[in-house]
């Protein structure tokens, strides 16, 4: 069925899906380059660079790449990094979804393909308007804002700028909650055990970001609450991937997985609704290390349920969210 957005978009419109990024290979050298770019972003590490850079270069980048490379090797596929593969598939699945006038591409905030490179490619293809679409349901300065920062920084260098719009966060959007509920419901139906608890694990952030006014924590809570309502059962909240010595958002996922068996919860399903596609944090940190921690602590059954990835429900959701934003861009009479 032809949508009104398809009928009315201008000659060329670009849609740029953006996710976090990944090393090019599961090797220490590649991981080091990736971590250097990622951890040098002041949106990610909010410490004065004069203080932070010596720590990053002399300690973190000399020790962490080897450990991280081993973790990446455990989840790497023949096609490459799961995050890179799945994000590319999402873009391909949306090709043609809004008519031939709309070009859908993808980029990574860190690593390749770079945001600047893909904006240039869309402009070269004749796109007069570009929708920047960070694939982060919950807004956070360290994810959503830095993606748009990078896009706008490149726009500042362009002589002929396209018109630009950004996809807003969609943590409570009915299309997103419905997609999550359908995906989780279908995955639960395939399990050979009945989980006593569903644990929704979101990427952690320093507690300080919440105190400074970042809405991320509240949006994660709202997503978990709405998903629980849609499923008709409680969804517990936790935060993973903490880094450094500072206090991060609680409860911590790893601590929760170790504590739950002692509370009588021995059968669990873990989901990661803040991630648009499976990646190191879900496939290694949750599905491998999280499983081991839960079972070693007395749990009997553990299931990690996949992210939305490039599933039919995900593509339907993205069509709804993106199509809504394209509605405002009318073709010249």
Which residue ranges define each predicted feature?
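Active-site-proximal alpha-helix that buttresses catalytic centers in soluble enzyme cores
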Residues: 2-333
């Amino acid at each position: 069925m032809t949508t009104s957005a398809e009928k009315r978009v201008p000659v060329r419109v670009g849609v740029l899906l953006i996710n976090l990024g990944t090393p090019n290979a599961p090797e220490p050298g590649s991981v080091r380059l990736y971590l250097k770019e990622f951890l040098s972003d002041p949106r990610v590490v909010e410490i004065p660079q004069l203080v932070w850079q010596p720590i990053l270069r002399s300690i973190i980048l000399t020790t962490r790449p080897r450990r991280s490379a081993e973790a990446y090797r455990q989840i790497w596929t023949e096609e490459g990094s799961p995050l890179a593969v799945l994000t590319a598939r999402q873009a391909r699945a949306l090709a043609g979804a809004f008519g031939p006038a709309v070009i859908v591409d993808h980029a990574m905030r860190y690593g390749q393909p770079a945001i600047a490179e893909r904006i240039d490619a869309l402009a070269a293809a004749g796109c007069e308007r570009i929708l920047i679409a960070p694939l982060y349901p919950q807004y956070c300065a360290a994810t959503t804002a830095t993606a748009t920062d990078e896009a706008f920084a490149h726009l500042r260098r362009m002589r002929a700028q396209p018109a630009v719009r950004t996809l807003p966060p969609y943590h409570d959007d009915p299309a997103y909650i419905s997609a999550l509920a359908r995906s989780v419901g279908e995955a639960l139906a395939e399990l050979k055990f009945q989980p006593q608890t569903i644990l929704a694990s979101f990427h952690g952030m320093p507690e300080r970001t919440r105190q400074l006014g970042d809405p991320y924590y509240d949006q994660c809570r709202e997503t978990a609450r709405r998903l629980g309502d849609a499923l008709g059962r409680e969804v517990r909240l936790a935060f993973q991937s903490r880094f450094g010595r500072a206090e991060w958002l609680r409860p911590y996922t790893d601590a929760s997985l170790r504590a739950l068996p002692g509370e009588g919860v021995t059968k669990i399903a873990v989901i990661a609704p803040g991630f648009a596609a499976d990646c190191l944090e879900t496939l290694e940190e949750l599905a491998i290390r999280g499983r081991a921690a839960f079972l070693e602590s007395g749990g009997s059954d553990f299931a990690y349920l996949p992210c939305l990835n490039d599933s039919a429900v995900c593509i339907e959701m993205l069509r709804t969210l993106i199509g809504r934003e394209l509605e405002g861009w009318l073709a010249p009479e």
